Amino acid sequence: MAEKRERVAYPLTFLLKKEGDLWASLACEVDVASCGDTREEAREMLKEAVALYVTDMVESGELDKVARPVPKDGLVEFATDPPGEMHIEYHTLLVSLSAVPPTLEFLPSMVRPADCQPAVAAA
């Protein structure tokens, strides 16, 4: 029987790219995108979009299907078309499964609490 998880951590790579007057943002590990007028707004809008996606997956009982990486050609297109200033950020999304709805918290720089299981088992 699988062990019931209380908290799960999802490591996320955010790509933030200047496209004309806007900033586009992409969470690579979950194939969720957003945008904003500034880099900071694009980051916050992406966090909100990722949180909505993960909450929906958890509430639908599809926790194991949350990770769905952006296809390689999608990454290449995001990075190169059109060319623009690009920033890469690393975050961890901490999901507490004991609450309904689940509670989510973004941690910077790949921080993961010691009592939290990774979302994807190491190979």
Predicted features and spans:
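Residue-level detector of intrinsically disordered, flexible termini
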Residues: 1, 23-26, 32, 121-122
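Short, charged, surface-exposed hinge/linker loops at domain edges
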Residues: 1-11, 40, 44-123
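Short aromatic-glycine-(Arg/Gly/Cys) micro-motifs in beta-strand/loop hairpins
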Residues: 10-29
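A short, exposed loop/beta-hairpin motif centered on an aromatic-Gly-Thr core
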Residues: 30-41
